[in-house]
Amino acid sequence: MPCPHNEITIVQRSQRQSAVAAAAYQSGEKLFCEYDQQVKHYPEKRGIVHNEILLPANAPPEYADRNTLWNAAEAVEKQWNSQLARRWVLTIPREIPPDQYAALVRDFCNQQFVSKGMCVDFAIHDKGDGNPHAHVMLTMRAMDERGKWLPKSRKVYELDKNGERIKLPSGRWKSHKEDTVDWNDRKYGEIWRHEWEVIQNRYLEANNRPERVDLRSYERQGLDIIPTVHEGAAVRQMEKRGIQTNIGNLNREIKAANSLMKSIRQLIKNLKGWIAELSEKRNELLAQKAAEEAVFLPNLLMKYERIDEDKTRHISIEIHF
C-alpha cells in the first residue's frame, strides 16, 4: 500500500542551518557556501537517482546552477533568524514504476510551486529498500519580472474613513506590514498535501493500479487508529540490523494497540450483529404469536357462540316439553 507520509520544514538560520548545505545533502553534489565560506559535501549519502532544478519564467537563467541558486537565496537574507528555504520530503508510491518518479515529482512541482513563482530544487532518493522518496526545496521569496528578489513584506499605511492616512501622536503614520506573498499561510499545507494525493492517484490509475493514497489524518478519515511515529532513515537502518530503538519500540507498541483495538471493534461489531439477529428473531416470534392469536381468538369466539346457541336451543326444547 502507498505510504501517506510527507513532511514540510523550514531551513532557518537561527537553527544554524544552511540552504546550501541542505541542497548539497539532497543532491549529492559538492557545493560551496559563500555565507560561511565552507564546502558542503555528504559523500556517505547513497541512493540519489535523480536531481533537477525547475525555474519560473522570470528567474535568471544562472539559477539553473544549484550552487548559484542557493547562494543567491541566502545572500538576500540579512537577518540572523532568516528563513532560507522550504523543504518537503515526499514518499513516492512503490507501485508506480521507478522510471516515472521524476515525472511525478516534476509535474507536481510545476503545478503547485513554479506556477506561483518559486524556484524548485528536487532530488529522488531510492536505495532499493522499498522507501523511494523525493526531497524538494523551495525558495521563500518572490521575484519581479527582471528576476530580482522581492521583499518578504511591505509597509501598508492604514487609512481613515475618508481615505486619509492616520497620524499617530508620535508624528508617524499608522501602518502595518503585509506579506508580499502568502506562501507561509497554513492553508497551503492542506492544499499541497491534497494536490500531492491527487497526482499520486492519477499516476496509480494510469498504471492500472488499484491502490489509492489518502493523505487525510486518520481522524479526518473517521478511523479510530493511533498514527505511528516517522522513523527516518537512521532508525530504519538500526532496526534492520536488529538494534531496537525508542522510536521503533514505540511504533511496535502503537501497532500492537491498534491491533488490539481492531480486535475489540470487531468483537463489538459481532456482538451488535448477534443482538440484531436476536432482536429480529424475537420480533418474528412475537409477530407469529400475534398472528396465531389473531386466528385463535375469533375461532374461540365462534366456538363459544355455537356452544351458547346449542345451550339456548337445548333449554328452549326442555321448556317446550
Over which residues does each language-model region extend?
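N-terminal nicking endonuclease/strand-transfer module with a His-rich metal-binding environment
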Residues: 1-321
